[in-house]
């Protein structure tokens, strides 16, 4: 394993862990795991995060081939400084950890009630048809797995962790970024699913945000001081 892969892996792992712990998708995974089978929630959430990491790394890898590498390097540097200041601002803001956890829980409760209301409108014939198809469909497309996947995927889309992964892949070895990102996502998601709401409620989102902001600023400074070939 080359030094560039190790550097990309280390940066991606640290960034992912500090970005995802206490994130909305972290809380969502913890709450879903309390209401549904953990293995399905873990598979759905982790599957979405792996797909998102790979897609983000591909975009970052392709960027230097479409835009001069010097420009992508400068853009990445600005992103790191911007995300660092943004994350620090979030960490020092007045919003409490319980507020975000309650917000995610309320959103999931609302979605569950909507789904239940739609289900009661189905006819008996539809129920019989669903029962006949259930063994095959459930083995491939579990509703719980799909729910966990969609909530996580769309929750992460456009998030600063996704944009930071794109920036890292543009500036570092993309293979290392993917490996570090996937390992970080696996660690955070597994902790959320196994720890449940009790773990999520005991995490100091403020301290995690401050640590993440400092890390982004360190990455930005390192990128600013480094040189890149045109």
Regions found by a protein language model. Give the residues of each.
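Membrane helix-loop-helix hairpins that form the core translocation module of multi-pass transporters
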Residues: 39-122, 195, 211-214
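Alpha-helical transmembrane segments and their helix-helix packing motifs
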Residues: 8-11, 66, 77-78, 132, ...
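Juxtamembrane boundary at the C-terminal end of a transmembrane helix
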Residues: 222-230
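Hydrophobic/aromatic residues within the transmembrane alpha-helices of Major Facilitator Superfamily
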Residues: 13, 17-21, 50-51, 85, ...
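Small-residue-enriched transmembrane helix starts and helix-helix packing motifs
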Residues: 1-21, 114-154, 177-179, 183
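Transmembrane alpha-helical segments of integral membrane proteins
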Residues: 56, 186-198
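Juxtamembrane transmembrane-helix termini in multi-pass membrane transport proteins
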Residues: 2-74, 164-183
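C-terminal functional regions that serve as terminal interaction/effector modules
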Residues: 213-223
